[in-house]
Amino acid sequence: MQGNEYTLPNGLRIIHEPTLSKVAYCGFAIDAGTRDEAENEQGMAHFVEHLIFKGTEKRKAWHILNRMENVGGDLNAYTNKEETVVYAAFLKEHLERALELLGDIVFHSTFPQHEIEKETEVIIDEIQSYEDTPSELIFDDFEDMIFRNHPLGRNILGKPELLRSFRTCLLYTSPSPRDTERS
């Protein structure tokens, strides 16, 4: 089967690939990963990925997590050097539910301060677990050697001291105009 690609007037690009499966997948791929972070923002993309599930203007965290699970679906996200992706897997009759939920968490997250404080500790635990894994550390050292002094050489999770400095006001700040050409 062949996919179709559309670009909406607001610049949102939609890729649709028909399938015969009863299971559907959809997501938002946000063209902002750790390579787009300034030195003092290391880990911000991954941090935001965690926080978007913690509340929106109309939903509490528990409602976000249960919205797809209640119909047998799954909601998840990941961050890499190039992008942050929020996605869902579900029975195709729940497409509208999935799109509405994904749109809500991507565009209307509230980043409550109490959730920022809790999630900071969750991610610091994740960093400590990561640091106990030699194969992960070797890969980080390898990337650091190749991309020395470039955001691509940094760890996606960030640094505990920077995570502790993140506040709601930083998360709402628009990205500074940076060179759109990726080097």
Give the residues covered by each predicted segment.
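Acidic/histidine-enriched segments that form metal/cofactor-coordinating
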Residues: 57, 64-170
